[in-house]
Amino acid sequence: MDHCLSVRLGAALAIALMLVPAVAGTGAAAEQASVLAWRQNRSSSLTSDSGWLTLAGLFWLKDGDNSFGSEPGNDLVLDNASLAPKAGTFTLSGSQVSFTPAADAGILLNGRAVDSTAPVKLASDAGGEPTELASGALRFFVIERSGRLGVRVRDLKNPRRLQFRGLTYFPIDNKWALRARFVAYQPARRIKIINILGMEEDDVSPGAVVFSQNGREWRLDTVLESPGDETLFIMFADATSGHETYGAGRFLTIPMPVDGVALLDFNKAYNPPCALNDFATCPLPPPQNRLPLRVEAGELKYSGGPEHSF
């Protein structure tokens, strides 16, 4: 799913910023500085070459050959001047995808032209970093979602990236920087997550966070994205969703709880990539994470972005 930390916020710096949060009484100035640093890192990540604003296409593969290029006669058509009319063919055989470029298509792998006489086996993002091909400003690679394989395209000159307006937020408020109780599940639970395309996956939930706000307790299930992660991931919706904030909910990444205590800073709640781009496959909050509470903190709806709801 499209909730990998490395592409949401940008690897080690993002983790460092979360692991030293200003939470629960450390002072307004410290909270302000922590959140502003986090916001800067988020904007830098979004506008980077691998940021969500570069996404320009997503094509699901059928078994066998899938011709790819900029002219209408191809199975996969991307109308872009950086792509040859007939760029090549993606071949799906079982769970393996290969690519055979057309002669003189100018397709590069690791900066070198790909041999048009031999297919190149492509690793998907399911096992980590996918094999990335290039054509001019375009980058394309294989993704796997719920057992389906597709080709994702990035355009380094995508107008969404070049015309990025910046992000807007609720005012920073210490009220939303909280210490929560972490309720561990023994054993960890599998929770069903549906993405924006209707695909289903089972994610691992090691436990829930329970926090107090407005005179009552609230509970959110967390997700462990990969074994050994230093963070937990939360998908949530609230009473601002579809109004001030993105209709399909928001995300929150928190440091791994210690001694049953979780640090939640909703001032660092952020939009899924689907709020910024039509070509992401964002997970939706599970029903138990949709709260009748106005979380007036974190990122607001992106002006000019796609709009989705449950």
List each model region and its residues:
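Surface-exposed beta-loop interaction hotspot
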Residues: 134-201
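Bacterial N-terminal signal peptides
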Residues: 10-22
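Bacterial N-terminal signal peptides that target proteins for export
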Residues: 1-13
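Forkhead-associated
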Residues: 54-55, 60-128
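An exposed acidic His-Trp-rich patch
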Residues: 111-125, 217-268
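Flexible, glycine-rich surface segments
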Residues: 179-241, 246
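Extended, aromatic/histidine-rich regions of cofactor-dependent oxidoreductases associated
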Residues: 166-169, 239-243, 251, 255, ...
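N-terminal pre-domain segments of enzymes
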Residues: 27-59
